[in-house]
Amino acid sequence: MINEIKKETEDKMKKTVEALRKEYQHIRAGRANPALLEKVTVEYYGAPTPVNQLANISAPEARLLVIQPWDKSVLPALEKAILKSDLGLTPTSDGAVIRLVIPQLTQERRSELVKTVKKRAEEHRVILRNLRRDANEDVKDLQKEHIISEDEGKRAQEEIQKLTDKYIREVDQVAERKEAEIMEV
């Protein structure tokens, strides 16, 4: 019983940290990264379609993304979708490919991004703490039903606390790395 609770809690905590890593991929750090366009969708045959399903996206240089659509007729729609997105990038097209030059981040924009990174990290720490609380409540329920002893319950809660500490440290490390990446000039 206790092992199931711990395993389930740890799985959820791993997923929380992975979700944070994925979120951070969408935060522009001044470098070209095809993941920046993952959330951009284009109206294609009446359905919103992600850019990466309509084109090949590559980063031939540190500050350049090249989008090569498989169907050239979708070029204007791709340009519009990129302009409408919250990326703040202006696409340039030569009729065959779209080039996105990633501008250098200003100090002000860097500070805003760092605040966003810290906010997201705190949100994920709260999620981890809520998972800990839920697991501890499950352990207490087992104690109340006399399925486990008080000592086993205490030991389980200590192990859950260690798991929580481990994953909070991981969130902190992921956030620190992203902050360093953003502040890198």
UniProtKB/Swiss-Prot annotation:
It comes from Heliobacterium modesticaldum (strain ATCC 51547 / Ice1). The keyword Disulfide bond does not apply. It is found in: Cytoplasm. One of its GO terms (biological process) is translational termination. GO terms for molecular function: ribosomal large subunit binding. Responsible for the release of ribosomes from messenger RNA at the termination of protein biosynthesis. May increase the efficiency of translation by recycling ribosomes from one round of translation to another. Disulfide bonds: none annotated. InterPro entries: Ribosome_recyc_fac, Ribosome_recyc_fac_dom, RRF_sf. The gene is frr. This is Ribosome-recycling factor. It holds the Pfam family RRF. GO terms for cellular component: cytoplasm. Its main location: cytoplasm. Belongs to the RRF family. Signal peptide: none annotated. Keywords: Cytoplasm, Protein biosynthesis.
